[in-house]
């Protein structure tokens, strides 16, 4: 496991390129600098043929190969139920925190190919193919 730091969004592409020959895959979470320059990171990963794995649907839509993370729609529904309770008089201290245990797999065969990998058909079947679906925050 290697850690690469990008102190500013303008450092993201260079930090990504520093992994050439040293990493088989890139994982990133929702870091503000990376999110601000995600396309630059994905472009560098494409050039080096290193797949990018992340934790959210929208990064897959922006260039990652895959993500395993919380579905924003489901997260919003849970949050909405908590807000409903508060608005109906429940004390915030009476509402227990909830952990989102249900994770969703998001995949992009198109981005995988650009990053030098082919996703197995079973992986594509088990996930949500963002190349063929609307974002979870858009109405159907």
Regions found by a protein language model. Give the residues of each.
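Short hydrophobic alpha-helices and adjacent helix-cap/hinge residues
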Residues: 1-140
């Amino acid at each position: 496991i290697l850690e690469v730091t990008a102190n500013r969004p303008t450092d993201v592409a260079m930090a990504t390129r520093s992994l050439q020959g040293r990493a088989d895959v890139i994982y990133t979470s929702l870091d503000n600098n990376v999110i601000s320059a995600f396309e630059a990171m994905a472009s560098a990963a494409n050039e080096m043929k290193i797949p990018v794995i992340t934790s959210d649907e929208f990064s897959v839509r922006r260039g990652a190969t895959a993500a395993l993370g919380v579905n924003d729609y489901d997260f919003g529904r849970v949050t909405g139920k908590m807000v409903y309770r508060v608005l109906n008089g429940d004390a915030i201290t009476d509402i227990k925190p909830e952990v989102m245990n249900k994770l969703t797999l998001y995949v992009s065969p198109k981005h995988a190919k650009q990053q030098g990998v082919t996703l197995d058909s079973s992986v594509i079947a088990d996930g949500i193919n963002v190349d063929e679906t609307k974002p979870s925050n858009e109405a159907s």
